[in-house]
Amino acid sequence: MRSSAPYHFGSPVGPEHFADREPELALLAGRMIGGISVIVHAPRRFGKTSLVRRGLLAAEAAGAGVGYANLLRCSTRREAAQTVVRAIFAGPLHRRDLLRRLGGLLERIRVRPTVEVATDGRVQLGFDPALADRDWGGAMGDACRILAEEAGRRPVALALDEFQQVAEIDAGLAGVFKAMLDEAPSVSFVLAGSHLHLMERLTTLPGAPLLGMGELLRLGPIPEPAMTAYLVRQSRRAGRPMDEAAARLVSALAGPVPNDVQRLAQSAFDTADAVIDAGCVERGMELAVSRQSATFAERYERLSGTAQRLLRLLAEGPVARPYARAVMTGLEVANDNAVRKALAALTFAELAVRTGGAWHVADPFLRRWLVSGAD
């Protein structure tokens, strides 16, 4: 049966929706198998998690033991330790004899985890929330020493996604993770993050605690020819072919973020009866905006008046000099501090981003909503 959803957005994509990134995938999988750590920097919705997961699958297929931990929901050291230790035992250490070996392994972790065994034999570890003041960094280090022993038998890779959250938990936690990497030099750690200013502070700026701890991989936009070929190919498989001009228009209106391109492509597909042309793309943009209009309105209403006016200004076109007198006059503010606060609020809410030396609205659908004055 032909698919009614040839494109995918909103969550990490599987192999069938993976558009390009083959060179990055080959590099990442090779480093995982080779025991070399990698630091992945990517703006949000650029396919970071999809790439990392595909790299883990490729490394596992080549015989590596792999694990994946998402730190986004961690707000304390205990939660970070629980997430990392769980990933280690559920991934690289999960072998047929794990249950037999489990007691001895857990004795080596200075904070004893709780243990649950699922019906399929999967082991779920945790730390009691009542245990407040414990050496959580030491517990992670203990687990990493066990992981290093496993790396003596086969390649081992552990991906720590949304790694920027480490900076939000506390100032010293990045040093704990550096010690972890030092404890297991033969393990490939993949530190992947999307808030670039935080990731740079953790990994690449002078004095960063994790500076030089892995090979840097920066994800940029998918090249337009590769994205066009993907859009056309997917539409043909689903029985509503998109012509190349329409595919290029999708990228022009929604790019450069792959997630946004796929969202618009799917909306254009939804409006088409047979062939997807430029008219379908324009109607698809209107449809995508209307589907998100309530969310846009809620986010807009939470902003201060100055931030609202600045966001509308950015929707009209990129602004290279936001502190210029003409900009402040248009925003009806008396000094650049008000502009600075508004930009900080828009950046924190991920509504505005600075690329190519200028500020602009981060979301193409929000930009269209602002320009059209939609309710």
Q: Can you describe what each PLM-predicted range is?
A:
Residues 331-348:
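Short amphipathic alpha-helical interaction segments
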Residues 126-195, 204-206:
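Conserved Walker B catalytic segment
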Residues 347-357:
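A short, conserved structural fragment
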Residues 262-334:
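Winged-helix-like regulatory helical subdomains adjacent to P-loop NTPase cores
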Residues 200-252, 273-275:
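Helix-loop-helix "sensor" segment of P-loop NTPases
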Residues 365-375:
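Short, amphipathic alpha-helical interaction segments positioned at domain boundaries
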Residues 1-38, 43:
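A short, basic N-terminal segment
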Residues 37, 42-46, 50-156:
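P-loop NTPase nucleotide-binding core
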